[in-house]
């Protein structure tokens, strides 16, 4: 069975590398400008009067490789923006501005125009301003194009959503993803291009081409989630990206997140699993599996969350609940994420 590690990505090694880097960052300002206590969360924040200024930075990873193969660059900028703004809203912040960074080996005016169009589409959907950026020509360092960005967001101090209020009895509402989003592309490319020898124009069994599926842009959840925060007491917010539902542990680590009512898995994930003979657990550790964002609320508020999502043309479902502990293999587990799928119970650690 093929794994994400076989495709060159070891998420556990990445976790160790990040911890090694973070362990060396010891300096903090000694004046009144203090960072928020959000270590390990989706975004960093620093005090600014009655507000927190929130910063997120991210790129599109190897999705750009597929864009180069298909010579189609107008959707990956949307992915870059989505990866940033979707992280920012996880603490209840409203994204307001973006700066981008593009590193190129060489680039044509046509590719630049496509990227510009995608940037405009992404900032429009996110309701943010693109206020600056940097383009670096690095022919001796990289091949192709790499695109990343940093988003600034703001939130009132007393309106931050940290996830610490998540408690047993709350429910998890999952918002439908548009597809693969921007994570797991290395494994998807290995399955489609190395194992099965398809190309970007090959049709998959459900009718779409490989390029159409892999270049579908990441869903931007800014507008519906900000509306949810205004209308409902939202306890926790989680952008489901690399690592899948493990991301829920960024919220309250003292509870169990039980995912046991998943909707139908999207066709792209079935294709990857079937063609690559990928195990269920590996799929859920690598991909969003059709749920791109989670909203945790009290049970009586779930219907309103679903209503708001549907108003923004996003299907939403109650996919699980918060519990003190879960049972698996005759053992009691605490402080974990349990996914039940295909008559299996899987711990996401």
UniProtKB/Swiss-Prot annotation:
Chemical reaction(s) catalysed: 2-formamido-N(1)-(5-O-phospho-beta-D-ribosyl)acetamidine + ATP = 5-amino-1-(5-phospho-beta-D-ribosyl)imidazole + ADP + phosphate + H(+)
Known EC number: 6.3.3.1
Cellular compartment(s): Cytoplasm
Top-level enzyme category: ligase
GO cellular component, one term: cytosol
S-S bonds: none
GO BP field: 'de novo' IMP biosynthetic process; adenine biosynthetic process
Chief localisation class: cytoplasm
Record's keyword terms, sorted: ATP-binding, Cytoplasm, Ligase, Nucleotide-binding, Purine biosynthesis
Pfam family of the protein (one): AIRS_C
Pathway in which the depicted protein is active: Purine metabolism; IMP biosynthesis via de novo pathway; 5-amino-1-(5-phospho-D-ribosyl)imidazole from N(2)-formyl-N(1)-(5-phospho-D-ribosyl)glycinamide: step 2/2
Alphabetical list of CDD domains matching this protein: PurM
GO MF assignments: ATP binding; phosphoribosylamine-glycine ligase activity; phosphoribosylformylglycinamidine cyclo-ligase activity
Record InterPro entries: PurM-like_C_dom (IPR010918), PurM-like_C_sf (IPR036676), PurM-like_N (IPR016188), PurM-like_N_sf (IPR036921), PurM_cligase (IPR004733)
Protein family according to the UniProt entry: Belongs to the AIR synthase family.
Protein name as catalogued: Phosphoribosylformylglycinamidine cyclo-ligase
Species this chain originates from: Methanococcus maripaludis (strain C6 / ATCC BAA-1332)
Gene that produces this protein: purM
């Amino acid at each position: 069975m093929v794994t994400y590690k076989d495709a060159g990505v070891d998420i556990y090694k990445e976790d160790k590398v990040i911890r090694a880097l973070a362990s060396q960052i010891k300096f903090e300002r000694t004046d009144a400008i203090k960072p928020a206590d959000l270590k390990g969360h989706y975004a960093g924040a620093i005090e600014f009067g009655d507000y927190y200024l929130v910063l997120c930075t991210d790129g599109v990873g190897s999705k750009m490789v597929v864009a180069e193969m298909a010579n189609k660059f107008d959707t990956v900028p949307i992915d870059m923006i989505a990866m940033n703004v979707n992280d920012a809203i996880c603490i209840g912040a409203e994204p307001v501005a973006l700066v981008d960074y593009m590193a190129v080996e060489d680039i044509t005016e046509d590719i630049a125009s496509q990227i510009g169009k995608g940037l405009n589409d992404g900032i429009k959907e996110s309701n943010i301003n693109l206020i600056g950026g940097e383009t670096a020509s690095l022919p001796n360092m990289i091949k192709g194009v790499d695109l990343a960005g940093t988003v600034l967001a703001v939130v009132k101090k007393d309106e931050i959503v940290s996830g610490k209020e998540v408690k047993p009895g709350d429910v998890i509402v999952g918002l439908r993803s548009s597809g693969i989003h921007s994570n797991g592309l290395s494994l998807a490319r290995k399955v489609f291009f190395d194992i099965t020898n398809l190309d970007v124009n090959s049709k998959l069994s459900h009718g779409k081409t490989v390029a159409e599926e892999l270049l579908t842009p990441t869903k931007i959840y800014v507008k519906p989630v900000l509306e949810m925060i205004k209308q409902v007491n939202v306890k926790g917010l989680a952008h489901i990206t690399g690592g899948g539902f493990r991301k829920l542990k960024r919220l309250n680590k003292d509870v169990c997140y039980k995912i046991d009512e998943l909707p139908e898995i999207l066709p792209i994930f079935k294709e990857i699993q079937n063609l690559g003979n990928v195990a269920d657990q590996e799929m859920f550790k690598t991909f969003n599996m059709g749920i791109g964002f989670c909203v945790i609320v009290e049970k009586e508020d779930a219907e309103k969350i679903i209503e708001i999502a549907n108003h923004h043309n996003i299907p939403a479902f109650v996919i699980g609940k918060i519990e003190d502990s879960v049972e698996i293999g005759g053992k009691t587990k605490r402080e974990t994420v349990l996914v039940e799928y295909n008559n299996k119970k899987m711990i996401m650690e």
